[in-house]
Amino acid sequence: MNIIQQYEAREIERLSGVRAVPEFIAGDTVRVGVRVVEGTRERVQSFEGVVIARSNKGLNSNFTVRKISNGEGVERVFPLYAPSIASIEVVRRGKVRRAKLYYLRGRSGKSARIAERPRDLPKADSMAAS
């Protein structure tokens, strides 16, 4: 591991201690709390939508969230470890078979829906032990 990788690993560990980053993948619906500064006041604005892409590049990891606002598609790219992100909450888990869901850009209505992933069931050996 070179010096840059060591530095990035330390920073990721430090930033993960400040704010927990939940496990999520493309297809999941997330609510991202973004810190917005208006004059002297600071407030948290939420942005809720479907994760259509996730790029894992260490400290430079980011994810793209898409939502429909007033009939218009809005996409926003968030750096995963940005200090402007107050919180990331997974609202629901989607079942998809792709890593990038760019095809949702051309769809609207029912064709843009994503099926919900069933909850993880307990394993059979843990059931037998009970």
Curated annotation (Swiss-Prot):
MF annotations from Gene Ontology: structural constituent of ribosome
Keyword Ribonucleoprotein: yes
Superkingdom of this protein's organism: Bacteria
GO biological process: translation
Entries under Pfam families matching the protein: Ribosomal_L19
A GO cellular component entry from the record: cytosolic large ribosomal subunit
Cross-referenced InterPro entries: Ribosomal_bL19, Ribosomal_bL19_CS, Ribosomal_bL19_sf, Translation_prot_SH3-like_sf
Keywords: Ribonucleoprotein, Ribosomal protein
HAMAP family, A to Z: Ribosomal_bL19
PANTHER family tied to this protein: LARGE RIBOSOMAL SUBUNIT PROTEIN BL19M, RIBOSOMAL PROTEIN L19
Function of the molecule: This protein is located at the 30S-50S ribosomal subunit interface and may play a role in the structure and function of the aminoacyl-tRNA binding site.
Family of this protein: Belongs to the bacterial ribosomal protein bL19 family.
Full protein name: Large ribosomal subunit protein bL19
Organism for this UniProt entry: Gluconobacter oxydans (strain 621H)
